Regions:
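Short, solvent-exposed beta-strand-terminating loops
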Residues: 17-21, 76-86, 131-133
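Conserved acetyl-CoA-binding loop-helix of GNAT-fold acetyltransferases
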Residues: 107-112, 118-135
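A short helix-loop-beta-strand connector motif used in the catalytic cores of GNAT acetyltransferases and
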Residues: 39, 45-65, 81-88, 106
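Conserved hydrophobic beta-strand within the GNAT/NAT acetyltransferase core sheet
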Residues: 107, 141-143
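Short hydrophobic/aromatic beta-strand or adjacent loop that forms the aromatic wall/cage
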Residues: 61, 177-182
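Conserved active-site alpha-helix within GNAT-family acetyltransferase domains
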Residues: 134-139, 147-174
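Conserved N-terminal entry element of GNAT/NAT acetyltransferase domains
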Residues: 1-37
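Conserved acyl-donor/pantetheine-binding loop and adjacent beta-alpha core of acyl/acetyltransferases
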Residues: 67, 71-109, 113, 117, ...
Length: 188
């Protein structure tokens, strides 16, 4: 398995990966970046164009791609909380310290290609995000995955509490019965 940051050279690989699923084919990982009406109005090609701009004009990169045998099989969005205004401003994150938004990185979503799931790709991506964020000056990494370890039929793109815990994250808040804020402090 190889993991690479999103850049211009990876946009075709991301298109192939996202094209394998109706949700990712429409959203293009814009859900937490833009107002809902803009994401929905841009469903498909417009969101793809926005994603390609993210790949070419954003630093740090908008996420990481996991490759197996030269084919993109997984994705994890990442970046400073300032990049994700919908997430940072949500009721789930109401207790966050906004003064940390530039230094604390956020992991809003994952996607793994059908046929490659349940192989540990998401965990490898999350571990790579932690390392990458630390190398680029982040003081912590957060996510708001699904709480517990029950069978979740929806919202798995957020990750799960056991996934984050396995990667050294600690629960810092439980804003709803279904969601938990997980955080990993970085000492780099």
């Amino acid at each position: 398995m190889e993991i690479h940051p999103l850049g211009p050279a990876q946009t075709d690989d991301a298109a192939d990966l996202f094209g394998s699923n109706a949700s990712t084919r429409g959203c293009w990982c814009m859900w937490f970046l833009l107002p809902v009406r803009d994401v929905q109005a841009g469903w498909g090609d417009t969101n793809r164009g926005r994603f390609e701009m993210l790949a070419t004009e954003t630093s740090p990169p908008g996420g990481l791609l996991a490759y197996q045998d030269g084919k993109a099989v997984g994705w994890c969005a990442m970046g400073p909380r300032t990049r994700y205004p919908r997430a940072a401003g949500s009721k789930l994150m109401a207790q966050r310290d906004p003064d940390e938004d530039a230094d604390v990185w956020f992991v809003p979503c994952f996607f793994v290609r059908t046929g490659s799931r349940r192989a540990g790709i998401t965990e490898q991506l999350l571990r790579a995000v932690v390392a990458y964020a630390g190398e680029h000056g982040a003081t912590a990494v957060e996510g708001f995955p699904l709480a517990g370890d029950g069978p979740h039929k929806t919202d798995r793109y957020l990750g799960t509490e056991p996934l984050f815990a396995a990667c050294g994250f600690t629960a810092i808040a439980r804003p709803t019965p279904r969601r938990v804020i997980m955080r990993r402090e970085l000492a780099y």
